[in-house]
Amino acid sequence: MFRLARAQTALANKASVSRSFLRLNSSFAIPETQKGVIFYENGGKLEYKDLPVPKPKANEILINVKYSGVCHTDLHAWKGDWPLPVKLPLVGGHEGAGIVVAKGENVKNFEIGDYAGIKWLNGSCMSCELCEQGYESNCLQADLSGYTHDGSFQQYATADAVQAAQIPKGTDLAEIAPILCAGVTVYKALKTADLKPGQWVAISGAAGGLGSLAVQYAKAMGLRVLGIDGGDGKEELFKQCGGEVFIDFRKSKDMVADIQEATNGGPHGVINVSVSEAAISMSTEYVRPTGVVVLVGLPADAYVKSEVFSHVVKSISIKGSYVGNRADTREATDFFTRGLVKSPIKIIGLSELPEAYELMEQGKILGRFVVDTYK
């Protein structure tokens, strides 16, 4: 009697598991728990601990995240100093690269075993005017990885299959991780500047995680690149990335004059990836007449100030550029896979994330930190 009951229970459990994995279309053994970093309040302790493995919805894929880039946005999400509130508790991270291990029943564009990337934009409505025009990141219903949706600072994370990045097999997952946000973001910013080969572009914050990639994308687009930054090793990294002229803001006595002299009248475009409010406003002074200033970095509570008379007489433009859409992602990834862009990364363990945030706050990071989720 009891033996029969146990057999029936075991059969029912097996059927339940089979249905579950069939529903998820998974052929991988997926654990119930995983390691991740989570915080329960803004500015609170970053806890490296066991977390439940999420289950993908019908439109989602489950990615076994191998590596994730560490972005300034992750720092803002933890601090909670942006006007957009984060979900709490939260697992941060939005530059995750890994392998698809499960998918919902409605997913058609990914197969189990494919390489996939988690981006800042996790999902959008795909039916509003903005989404129809390719501005998915501006959708009022946008779901953001590592901000409103648990992100890639964990070993398993979900992503909307429509927005997830498709990564070619054989790609170095550690090196492509920063491309999924930093790379796409600066690539889109350079497209927004709409410059022509041979023209000058200034990258403000040229040796950081975004800036070091912006220098390379700009060079690959045929632009002449002036970099602005300050700190040990930053000029060397800038030159390694292909930059032409470096201005150290710590040493320059007249930034505007030095930049305009180096570029024969000022750069045709400026990409502001720095989080310095003063540097952003200064870019409106040194950009050449008819030039364009592109805002990318997001310092909390900051304003860009442009003196109206000069703004009008010089006929300059100020534009905001906010990440990129699916086409931008595909194009930015293609630059990387063809070897035109390389990620200057330092790999650390996921458990070391708090130390990475501390160095980021101090402005001591060259290139990009990438976390190994299994360390």
Curated annotation (Swiss-Prot):
Catalytic activity, as annotated: a primary alcohol + NAD(+) = an aldehyde + NADH + H(+); a secondary alcohol + NAD(+) = a ketone + NADH + H(+)
Binding site for NAD(+): G205, A206, A207, G208, G209, L210, G211, D229, K234, V296, G297, L298, R368
An annotated GO cellular component: mitochondrial matrix
UniProt KW keywords: Metal-binding, Mitochondrion, NAD, Oxidoreductase, Transit peptide, Zinc
Cofactor note (record): Binds 2 Zn(2+) ions per subunit.
EC number(s) per entry: 1.1.1.1
Plastid among keywords: no
Cofactor(s), by name: Zn(2+)
Classification via InterPro entries: ADH-like_C (IPR013149), ADH-like_N (IPR013154), ADH_Zn_CS (IPR002328), GroES-like_sf (IPR011032), NAD(P)-bd_dom_sf (IPR036291), PKS_ER (IPR020843)
UniProt protein name: Alcohol dehydrogenase 4, mitochondrial
Species in which this protein is naturally found: Kluyveromyces lactis (strain ATCC 8585 / CBS 2359 / DSM 70799 / NBRC 1267 / NRRL Y-1140 / WM37) (Yeast)
The gene coding this protein: ADH4
